[in-house]
A protein has these predicted regions:
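Divalent metal-dependent hydrolysis catalytic cores, especially in the metallo-beta-lactamase
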Residues: 83-136, 152-165, 187-202, 221-226
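Metal-associated gating/positioning segment near the N- to mid-region
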Residues: 46, 51-114
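Active-site gating loops and adjacent loop-to-helix segments of metal-dependent hydrolytic enzymes
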Residues: 75-78, 82-98, 147-168, 178-181, ...
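C-terminal cap of metal-dependent C-N hydrolases
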Residues: 8-10, 19, 28, 353-400
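Active-site core of metal-dependent hydrolases
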Residues: 181-296, 304-305
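His/Asp/Glu-enriched, well-ordered alpha-helical/loop segment
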Residues: 277-357, 361-363, 398
Length: 473
């Protein structure tokens, strides 16, 4: 299984310029200047992709998705559906990190690990956290440390809720112990050992996180607070934390205007721009979707409108806003969903277009619309709007000739009336005149010699038509 992508503009995420990129099986094996790798000499099975006018980025990493579904806070009817590989990859996501949220009972770690394994077997890359909102943490084994050490897919703990009415209202000691155990599991297994922390609306904001960093030996690298753009106060506190070296995770939105105007969230592109202007390290910011999580929607008057569902589609949408609205360079914007989460979560072989890395790639056009998505070396999505398949061409041609057929049938009937009233000769003579006229029209339209169904009907003198009904000898 080989792919050769030629003459494509590479953002790795740093801008490399025009390159030829060769993948074999699930790895990137060669990146050379455009025109350096010839298609000659490769096996006939090698797929050659013309990258002229297109961009190549790493596959996207969505580091916070409720892959088992979320919600249930308004009752069982509000439980949201599970994520699917197709539903993730069509938005460019080739790597996903699953988590449990408010509900750690109806959904548990056995189901989460099984779902994660399933996504891996289907052809993308998937990891997960152990636990949910609650402390004590509900683990798969009997401890956080053992979960991280012994379960390959588990890379940390989360999403642990603080500063939220739905949290377990953990004490400082309880929260610090969770972070410490998670770090130990990471140290012993060579994983990130990171705690994904859900931040709520409470004005306490990051208080527990800041105390752990200030009062213990645990570094900021072990904690990733998410939903930091929930409100202005939380955003400002999170920016202070990021200026100290902490990593922060923005939650993207599909309906960006709604969440900014009605819910007073900080727009992701504006938040990233403000952090960059303040001097925050661009490598310490990520964007995730909170995918499949339930999103209650309210009007400006506070009226409940319904329950939405988080979608990974927001990742690329937020990147576009960063590039086109706030003029953040593409290499910085795209790093928030590629190299940054890969580095922070220590996902080996992920997040970069680099020799030896996994062949997880996104091909985009100049407007940053997805053209093709490659996961583990396999094409998992093609934008039919940009790449028309052979079947689509045949279908389109069939529809065209069907329409043409109907057009000439109608034209024949109209001509029948015209000829009947202008000529008083016999019926067969009129039919011959119609056929001659129709052939002239067809030739003028450059369809001379093309057999169209309508003309077979014209040759059938037994056909029921207006001319035969009204003609009288």
């Amino acid at each position: 299984m080989m792919k050769l992508i030629q003459n494509i503009d590479v953002y790795a995420p740093q801008h490399l310029g025009k390159k030829d990129v060769l993948t074999i099986n699930d790895k990137i094996v060669k990146i050379k200047d455009a025109g350096s790798i010839s298609a000659e000499g490769f096996l006939s099975e090698t797929e050659i992709i013309n990258g002229e006018g297109l961009l190549l980025t790493p596959g996207f990493i969505d580091s916070h998705v409720h892959v088992l579904g979320g919600g249930g806070e308004g009752g069982f009817a509000n439980r949201t559906p599970e994520a699917t590989m197709e539903g993730l990859t069509k938005f460019g996501v080739t790597t996903v990190v699953g988590c449990l949220g408010t509900d750690g009972i109806g959904r548990d770690m056995c189901a989460l690990v099984a779902k994660t394994k399933g996504l891996n077997e289907q052809g993308m890359s998937a990891y997960c956290y152990t636990g949910s909102y609650q402390i004590p943490v509900r683990t798969l084994t009997d401890s956080i440390v053992k979960d991280i050490m012994m379960i390959q897919e588990i890379i940390g703990t989360g999403e642990i809720a603080i500063s939220d009415h739905r949290s377990s209202q953990p004490t400082f000691e309880e929260f610090a112990r969770v972070v410490a155990d998670t770090r130990l599991g990471g140290v012993l297994s060579g994983k990130a050992g990171i705690v994904n922390v859900h931040l709520g609306d409470s004005p306490r904001c990051l208080d527990l996180i800041e105390r752990v960093v200030d009062e213990t030996e645990i570094p900021t690298s072990q904690i990733l607070p998410t939903h930091i753009n929930r409100n202005e106060l939380l955003f400002c506190k999170s920016m202070e934390y990021a200026l100290k070296g902490g990593a922060v995770d923005f939650t993207g939105n599909e309906d960006i205007d709604y969440w900014e105007t009605i819910c007073d969230e900080v727009r992701v592109c504006n938040g990233i721009k403000r952090m960059l202007d303040a001097g925050v390290n661009p490598n310490r910011m990520t964007i995730s979707s909170d995918g499949q999580g339930s999103l209650p929607m309210y009007s400006s008057d506070g009226e409940f409108l319904g329950m939405g569902v988080g979608q990974s589609s927001c990742l690329l949408k937020e990147v576009k806003e960063c590039v086109f609205k706030t003029e953040i360079p593409l290499e910085i914007a795209i790093s928030t969903i590629t190299s940054n989460p890969a580095d922070i979560l220590r996902l080996k072989g992920k997040g970069k277009v680099e020799e030896g890395y996994d062949a997880d790639l996104c091909i985009l056009d100049q407007e940053l619309q997805l053209v093709e998505v490659i996961a583990k070396g396999n094409t998992v999505y093609k934008n039919k709007g940009n790449l028309m398949s052979e079947a689509s061409v045949i279908q389109l041609a069939g529809a065209f000739f069907t329409t043409l057929n109907l057009f000439f049938r109608a034209l024949y009937d109209i001509m029948g009336f015209v000829v009947f009233y202008r000529h008083k000769n016999g019926y067969k003579e009129n039919v011959l005149l119609i056929n001659q006229t129709a052939k002239k029209i067809l030739k003028a339209l450059s369809f001379d010699g093309v057999e169209v169904e309508a003309f077979r009907h014209m040759a059938d003198l037994k056909r029921l038509d207006p001319m035969k009904i009204f003609y009288k000898k």
